[in-house]
Design a protein with these regions (language model features):
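Extreme N-terminal segment that seeds HTH/winged-HTH DNA-binding domains in transcriptional regulators
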Residues: 1-35, 41, 89-132
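Short, mixed-charge, low-aromatic patches
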Residues: 9-16, 49-58, 69-76
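Short hydrophobic/aromatic-rich motifs at helix boundaries and adjacent loops
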Residues: 10-11, 28-29, 44-45, 67-72, ...
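Short secondary-structure transition/capping segments
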Residues: 46, 80-81, 122-125
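Enrichment for repetitive, rod-forming helical segments
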Residues: 47, 62, 79, 94-95
Length: 132
């Protein structure tokens, strides 16, 4: 399976790659234990520099999203749970970015909540289809 990445100007590719991978893991596009593409393969597929890809994969390993098995490659790990305070902190950062972008676009809080509900439902359906 190939990771999907839509390059957004103004945001570091490293951050976009991390987000795309985490989204793929959470949505069930990649299953626990499934092989993850090598640095070279992923860099070639996404047309990004291998050093950026290497740093992103190493970050995902350190954060517990991936596991490296010498001789076998890198596989998807169980998503890290972290402490509730850590999870809230990570979410807060994303919410701040979402709020700024929504305001910039002139959207109301209702628009944002509705869009979030739709996306949440899509993730639930994708996970269900993936056999979770």
């Amino acid at each position: 399976m190939t990771l999907r990445l839509t390059i957004r100007p103004g945001e570091p590719i490293f951050d976009q790659l991390i987000f795309a991978a985490q989204k793929a893991f959470i949505s069930g596009e990649y299953q626990v234990g499934e092989a993850f593409p090598s640095v070279r393969a992923l860099a070639a597929d996404l047309n990004i520099h291998p050093s950026t890809t290497h740093k992103a994969i190493q970050h995902l390993i350190r954060e517990g999203w991936l596991e490296n098995h010498p001789g076998k490659g890198t596989v998807v790990a169980r998503p890290p749970q972290g402490r509730p305070s850590e999870r809230r902190h990570l979410l807060q950062h994303e919410v701040e970015q979402l709020a700024v972008e929504a305001k910039r676009l002139g959207l109301s809080m209702t628009d944002v909540v509705d869009a979030l509900a739709v996306q949440w439902s899509k993730l639930d359906k994708t996970k269900g289809a993936a056999g979770e």
